[in-house]
Amino acid sequence: MMEDKQYKGTTTIGIICDQGVVLATERRATMGNFIASRDAQKIYRITDNAAMTIAGSVGDGQRLARILQVEAKLFELRRHGSMSINALSMLLSNILAEMRYAPYYVQVLIGGLDKAGPKIYSLDPLGGRIEEEKFVSTGSGSPIAYGVLEDRYKPGMSVEEGVELAARALESAMKRDSASGNGMQFCVITAEKFEIFEREVSKQVINA
């Protein structure tokens, strides 16, 4: 039962690029076969150099995002510096592990840029944590997205190329996964900028 909730109803993507990271999601939120929202927020800014995506329970994901935002701000005030992406992912891993008997039904990507370079970590509901070296996808549309990512990913690609690849993978997932759709949202994190923006899907997806 937990596994069903864990992977239900979304597609999220993370891509390591030459100068930063790209996170991407579609906008649909579902309750079973019912489309509950067509503009769901699935990317959350944690710090000026880190963000997270959620797949699974929206409420659980929002709560975890708020916890991380507060903890990261407290760290900044006490230590006069930002938490590393590794530290953020370890903190979230510990939070999830402590709740393993009443778990958050959510799968999370944490991505960003720090002194160690661009980093993306994926975390499961029980606190399992993996550092991704190239790209990652979560949610019900991820098996379809992975086909595009594996075929077209190139080491050292720019964030602009990463956005285009993520868009292509999301659109492929939307064509086949009924729980994914209704537009795309992207987060680009580099040393120069933190940007969250939206993009409409192509006509081919709308007419599919």
Curated annotation (Swiss-Prot):
EC number: 3.4.25.1
SUPFAM superfamilies: N-terminal nucleophile aminohydrolases (Ntn hydrolases)
Gene Ontology biological process terms from the UniProt entry: proteasomal protein catabolic process
Pfam families: Proteasome (PF00227)
Key word Nucleotide-binding present: no
Top enzyme class: hydrolase
Origin: domain of life: Archaea
One GO term describing the cellular component: proteasome core complex, beta-subunit complex
Residues annotated as the enzyme's active site: T10 (nucleophile)
Keyword field: Autocatalytic cleavage, Cytoplasm, Hydrolase, Protease, Proteasome, Threonine protease, Zymogen
Residue numbers covered by the propeptide annotation in the UniProt entry: 1-9
Reaction catalysed by this enzyme: Cleavage of peptide bonds with very broad specificity
One GO molecular-function entry: threonine-type endopeptidase activity
Activity control note: The formation of the proteasomal ATPase PAN-20S proteasome complex, via the docking of the C-termini of PAN into the intersubunit pockets in the alpha-rings, triggers opening of the gate for substrate entry. Interconversion between the open-gate and close-gate conformations leads to a dynamic regulation of the 20S proteasome proteolysis activity.
Main localisation: cytoplasm
Subcellular location: Cytoplasm
Family per record: Belongs to the peptidase T1B family.
HAMAP family with a match to the protein in the record: Proteasome_B_A
Role of this protein: Component of the proteasome core, a large protease complex with broad specificity involved in protein degradation.
Quaternary organization: The 20S proteasome core is composed of 14 alpha and 14 beta subunits that assemble into four stacked heptameric rings, resulting in a barrel-shaped structure. The two inner rings, each composed of seven catalytic beta subunits, are sandwiched by two outer rings, each composed of seven alpha subunits. The catalytic chamber with the active sites is on the inside of the barrel. Has a gated structure, the ends of the cylinder being occluded by the N-termini of the alpha-subunits. Is capped at one or both ends by the proteasome regulatory ATPase, PAN.
Name assigned to this protein: Proteasome subunit beta
Organism of this sequence: Methanocella arvoryzae (strain DSM 22066 / NBRC 105507 / MRE50)
Gene behind this protein: psmB
